[in-house]
Amino acid sequence: MGKKSILTTPVSRRGAITLGLGTVATLALAGCGGGGGSVDSASTGSASTGGSGSYKVAMIMSGTVTDGGWDQGHYESLKRAVESHPNWEMLEPKENTADADAASAAQSYVDMGVNLIVGNGNQFASTWAEVVADAADSNPDVNFLITNTDPERELTDYTSLDHVMTVLPDFMQTGALAGVVAGLMTKTKSIGFIGGMKLPSTTKKYAAFLAAAQKVTPGVTGQYNFEAGFTDASLGTKLTEQWINSNNVDVMWGDASAVDNGARQALEAAGADTHFDIAQPIDIVGDDQPTVITSTVTDWMIGQAMDDIEGGSFGGGKAITGNMDNKGISLGKFSDKVPADVQSKIAEYADQVKSGSFLTDDEVSAIESTL
């Protein structure tokens, strides 16, 4: 189904956050992407942007808003939500929040009476239980949204879920969209994927990616690495160079933030007119990204959470699913390297992905079970 690279470094994201960013062994974050740090070096959350209405929203993140991946994607989702909700005011996010500081960071916003506190990854699920329980009694107008979190698996130790919800993107749709593009654009029938850490979301994305590519172009093979971390661009370069030289890979998709930048460097060195990258989770197609032909874009559904708070239906530990129907998942712009007829085919397949008729769960599971 796919071949795992020999260049792997298993690492605990949570443990690596405390070690810094010096080596591959320190590359990790529980939610996805970005480096560790402390609240002391982060934004205090005192400044604000957006509207001046009766609601306030703030985000706590593991990395920085300019990381080009996970954290920036969350920040852009937050900005879009505030722009479409003029009665909400956005406080500046707390960046580079380490696990040890996550609870105190959340508590500071609770003390300010912030109506919606967003944690950008499941690392916050394991550190906020006590803060959430206390806030339910002392500040019932405060609500918590934790992204990339399965409430049935990751909120089991919460004593109160009255003011908590999570967001789960449709990973199968995301992977399928990327796979359709890769399958139609590869000339060598060899594609690659780099993930920061082996999580259920990572393996689901890759399995759908490969299954979709094989459906549109039979015979496609996949190379993968799920343990690359999120900060070492040079590792992304090494992995991609290895796959280009040994496996003739000509299309890459990544889920590893800064590591993806390194993969793009290797693709460009091999020839930007013949070697392509599909970016995620933000749309970065442009002249400064010569290998990027499109992007799989994730919106973290913060606007829906705001609507639920205003409507009085927020809470209960429910998960908001981001998918193609509610624009939680989409494809970004196309580079002019994607021919018009290929773009038309992609649109046709994307409609099938959206309707659920393109891939079956069994087709994806058949690949995922081998990983």
Residue ranges and their predicted role:
Residues 6-7, 34, 371:
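Short, aromatic- and cysteine-enriched interfacial helices/patches
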Residues 1-11, 15, 19-30:
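N-terminal secretory signal peptides
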Residues 32-44:
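Bacterial lipoprotein signal-peptidase II cleavage site
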Residues 42-371:
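A residue-level marker of the well-folded mature domains of exported/periplasmic proteins
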